[in-house]
Amino acid sequence: MSYNRRSKNITQGVARSPNRSMYYALGYQKEDFDKPMIGIANGHSTITPCNAGLQRLSDAAVAAVKDAGANPQIFGTPTISDGMSMGTEGMKYSLVSREVIADCIETCVQGQWMDGVVVVGGCDKNMPGGMIALARINVPGIYVYGGTIRPGHWKGHDLTIVSSFEAVGEFTAGRMSQEDFEGVEKNACPTTGSCGGMYTANTMSSSFEALGMSLLYSSTMANPDQEKVDSAAESARVLVEAVKKDLKPRDIITKQSIENAVSVIMATGGSTNAVLHYLAIAHAAEIDWSIEDFERIRKRVPVICDLKPSGQYVATDLHAAGGIPQVMKLLLDAGLLHGDCMTITGRTLAEELKDVPSVPRADQKVIHPIDQALYKEGHLAILKGNLAEDGAVAKITGLKNPVITGPARVFDDEQSALAAILDDRIRAGDVVVLRYLGPQGGPGMPEMLAPTSAIIGKGLGESVGLITDGRFSGGTWGMVVGHVAPEAFVGGTIALVQEGDSITIDAHKLLLQLNVDDAELARRRAAWKQPAPRYTRGVLAKYAALARPANQGAVTG
């Protein structure tokens, strides 16, 4: 039986003789035209450690596709480094790159009539970009995560990239020596691989195991390890079998499997960015999913993993403790996962987890039993109020001060806010407002890791609030609220905040409130004028023109 269901459109028949001529130039033989064409979307790049170790994974996938009797077709996907662009204008391209990656994969797979695709990625937006593409085109596909970085070490302390961001605030506050500052800087990132805590890259890749679109254990492997290469090869073999079975992403990505993915995100203390990305993935798969669904799952799924940024451990520790399968087995036994969801292997999630122990190992402290959860409810909460009528997102677990009411310190760009923090112009009790940074206004919802880390480094993490219509890095923690919708650029209430206004952030009531009377707000609204777009040409201008609100995933189509 032939499995080239799609590629036959470009290789078969008399009229396709010129097409075959070009394939012959690539080394194809006549018998190859009856084999399926498998794309390898290779995100390898030397601009970031997150992607610098992907080539050997892609090479392993190519070899495995050949061994499985199919034709590998390699094409590239772009990336930017969130960590390197953080705190600069370059960060505005981060979320935009999610859309660009999705469009690149769609363009190559559809334009070349590929029968399946192995997506290999590393940095934060590689994962949602790839999964959006797979859900959109609905061609058999699998996601191969590049793997996590190993933790750095300095004077007996484990380090991640967030350690370096927080060191900026500590150093400028006089709380860290020059030696330690440089020691953290030089040792925070010791290997290739994505940032090591349960930040955005590890959050999304972990959730893909639960979604059913990545192999078990693959998300917590370290990039430098041989098992990561072996997993990439096995993923490619599984994908070829999925092509033979005609098992497509939308057979796997369902509302129930997204619930599984989000449940794992809650259980592991994952990134706020997951809210934005799963809204986008669901949209691509044409699944009814809203921010209210996150709140529904938060209320029933506890946090059972002690992982950075708010906890102690990193992804390699989680891997040693049993990985995401161990987390999923605990959730499944507690009735918190849909075990009948299909996975890319052709087996159900429950079948995949059959041999995983029901009790986590006693010699580890990363994964807690359900009855010993760190928090009884999930950490990613949807806040609403007159400052966020369409919702905002916050991490609410572990806060020493879950309610803050304080004067607004208003900034219309990130750099001004960061300067104020580093210059000690932000005081305990203040609520920093960073606005005109939403999908349209930023554009691109840049992440605010630099200012939030500076606040923590200054020792103000428990006493200063920060709200924004932009985003936060997965490495952010503290009294911070992002994804405020409607955003300032379209006239959301956040645009009407004035310096010194009283603002309340209440994690108990899930409230984000500007304490100004309605008459005054109406007066301000009547006087407000939309600012001119920051960009009028190029990809940022295109994104700003097309982007939907944050509560709809900030998608472009």
Swiss-Prot record:
Native source species: Burkholderia mallei (strain ATCC 23344)
Keywords: 2Fe-2S, Amino-acid biosynthesis, Branched-chain amino acid biosynthesis, Iron, Iron-sulfur, Lyase, Magnesium, Metal-binding
Tagged with keyword Magnesium: yes
Cofactor note: Binds 1 [2Fe-2S] cluster per subunit. This cluster acts as a Lewis acid cofactor.
Co-factor(s): [2Fe-2S] cluster; Mg(2+)
Keyword Cytoplasm: no
InterPro entries tied to this protein: DHAD_IlvD/Edd, Dihydro-acid_dehy_C, DihydroxyA_deHydtase, DiOHA_6PGluconate_deHydtase_CS, ILV_EDD_C, ILV_EDD_N, IlvD/EDD_N
Example GO biological process: isoleucine biosynthetic process
Pathway field: Amino-acid biosynthesis; L-isoleucine biosynthesis; L-isoleucine from 2-oxobutanoate: step 3/4; Amino-acid biosynthesis; L-valine biosynthesis; L-valine from pyruvate: step 3/4
Residues carrying N6-carboxylysine: K125
Reaction catalysed by this enzyme: (2R)-2,3-dihydroxy-3-methylbutanoate = 3-methyl-2-oxobutanoate + H2O; (2R,3R)-2,3-dihydroxy-3-methylpentanoate = (S)-3-methyl-2-oxopentanoate + H2O
Active site residues per record: S473 (proton acceptor)
Protein name according to UniProt: Dihydroxy-acid dehydratase
Gene giving rise to this polypeptide: ilvD
SUPFAM superfamilies per record: IlvD/EDD N-terminal domain-like (SSF143975), LeuD/IlvD-like (SSF52016)
GO MF annotation: an example: 2 iron, 2 sulfur cluster binding
Family: Belongs to the IlvD/Edd family.
Residues binding [2Fe-2S] cluster, per UniProt: C50, C123, C195
Residues binding Mg(2+): D82, D124, K125, E447
Function: Functions in the biosynthesis of branched-chain amino acids. Catalyzes the dehydration of (2R,3R)-2,3-dihydroxy-3-methylpentanoate (2,3-dihydroxy-3-methylvalerate) into 2-oxo-3-methylpentanoate (2-oxo-3-methylvalerate) and of (2R)-2,3-dihydroxy-3-methylbutanoate (2,3-dihydroxyisovalerate) into 2-oxo-3-methylbutanoate (2-oxoisovalerate), the penultimate precursor to L-isoleucine and L-valine, respectively.
Subunit structure and binding partners: Homodimer.
Pfam families xrefs: ILV_EDD_C, ILVD_EDD_N
EC number in record: 4.2.1.9
